[in-house]
Amino acid sequence: MIEHIDSLNDARLDVFMRLTEVQLRNKLEPEKGVFIAESDKVISRALNAGYEPLSLLIPNHKLALMQSLIERINAINPAIPVFVAPAQEIKNLTGYELTRGILCAFRRKPLVSVKKLLMGAKRVAVLENITNHTNIGALFRSAAALNVDAIILNQGCCDPLYRRAIRVSMGTVFRVSWTRVGEDPRAVKVDDILAENSEETSPDKERQKLSSYAYQGDALRWPHEALVRLKELGFTTAALALNDNSVALDDPRLKACEKLALLFGTEGEGLSYQTLEECDYVVKIPMAHGVDSLNVAAASAVTFWELCR
């Protein structure tokens, strides 16, 4: 449903600029969360992945070019608003020129448990405390291209559905299934609530009831419970890091693993000591000219090429 906007003060446009990424994500109620996708190609990939469109924003001079996409969204629900406004007015609203022609707000999907995510998976990436959205987007793009079945992020990682991460990934964040593990320090603590209500309810039932509010994804504690779960599901764990016990990336034992989980750490300090201690292998990428490390996005691409084909 096309609506020409007379005033950018319209509250329905808040989702495109006036709400922060954190407000869009709505961590305590992820079923109400929203993300923004840019460009017809990325929006089409989100639609292909089954995400629910909520509204679109298009500069008036791009309206004709986006007609086929608008028709596709109208077929999903003709009541979905397509807001149209002059390009300069949209720039004033968003703070930048809409060079990719279109923005679309989508409803987030609930995240699933690790067990459900990894049904049928053979090669997975596990990310710890990676906070750079460009790196997250690039890593997802490499994972999609190089046959990674799923990605697990701990709560210290940034959001794969952050606008920049989606843009860098070219929408491949919608093609690789993912979830989060670990307690979110910014969310309600289940154990604290249980302590307050210990005499009134069964802890197991109360934990199950509250977990969807306190955690986004799987409430397995990071790293111990998450890595134990991976091993219970048959995965060998291999951490990318440089230490005295590292094996080379082309070690035949790694390729021989039926199920392999590849762990990557934060851009600066890498994986934590506890995480390294709990992994089956520590793996290094052989390098020349005295270079001792690669950017995590580059390292993941090299690793996926070697072990996920």
Q: Whereabouts are the PLM-identified features?
A:
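Glycine- and other small-residue-rich loops at beta-strand/loop junctions that grip anionic moieties
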Residues: 5, 35, 128-129, 154-155, ...
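A glycine-rich helix N-cap at a beta->alpha junction
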Residues: 78-86
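Structured adenosyl-cofactor binding patch, chiefly the S-adenosyl-L-methionine
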Residues: 101-104, 144-146, 160-173, 273-309
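RNA substrate-binding interface of SAM-dependent RNA methyltransferases
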Residues: 110-245
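Active-site/ligand-binding-proximal alpha/beta "capping" segment
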Residues: 238-288
